[in-house]
Design a protein with these regions (language model features):
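Short, surface-exposed coil-to-beta transition loops
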Residues: 98-103, 116-118, 129-133
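Short, solvent-exposed loop/hinge segments that bridge or flank secondary-structure elements
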Residues: 39-76
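Short beta-strand segments that buttress and anchor functional surface loops
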Residues: 40-42, 88-95, 116-122
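Edge beta-strand at a domain terminus
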Residues: 123-144
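Bacterial N-terminal signal peptides
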Residues: 9-20
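N-terminal secretory signal peptides that target proteins for export/translocation
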Residues: 1-6
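Mid-chain, well-packed structural core segment of small domains
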Residues: 90-107
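N-terminal helix-cap/turn-to-beta initiation motif at the start of protein domains
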Residues: 24-37, 81
């Protein structure tokens, strides 16, 4: 009887310690992205006077953390992967004569983001253009 009681006490202590701990590990893998409206800037790298930075306001969330306008007509997100604080993606935009593929990454820290995007633009009968951009951004508030 004494052994059985000791086992029950040990088991109850184990479960009272294990369950809260296991819920920490079972939690959904989320990046430290505060959802809302984000002001995203893409600056060509290295900076030149010919290319002004591309600035856009995007609504970002845990389900849509990629800081590019993939909802634009002719654009689609091909892959998205999350590792720790960083989102990696491949996207493609098709216009009449051009196809632009972008490969990028964005590392979040609550209200700010930093990363890089490499684009490859090809057009029929023209040489493929490759560009590298530095990506920065800050959360501005709630989405409208």
């Amino acid at each position: 009887m004494r052994v059985r009681r000791l086992s029950l006490i040990t088991l109850s202590i184990f479960w009272s310690l294990f369950l809260p701990l296991s819920s920490c590990f079972a939690a959904k893998n989320e990046i430290p992205l505060k959802e809302g409206a984000w002001n995203i800037t893409l600056q060509i790298n290295p900076p030149t006077s010919d290319f002004l930075p591309i600035v856009q306001m995007l609504c970002l969330s845990q389900t849509e953390p990629v800081p590019i306008p993939a909802k634009k007509e002719g654009c689609r997100l091909l892959t998205k992967e999350i590792e720790g604080n960083t989102v990696f993606w491949v996207a493609e935009c098709r216009e009449k004569e051009f196809v632009t593929r972008s490969v990028g990454n964005a590392t979040y820290d609550s209200n700010k983001v930093e990363g890089a995007v490499q684009t490859m633009t090809s057009a029929t009968g023209k040489e493929t253009e490759m560009r590298t951009y530095t990506l920065t951004g800050k959360r501005q508030g709630n989405c409208r």
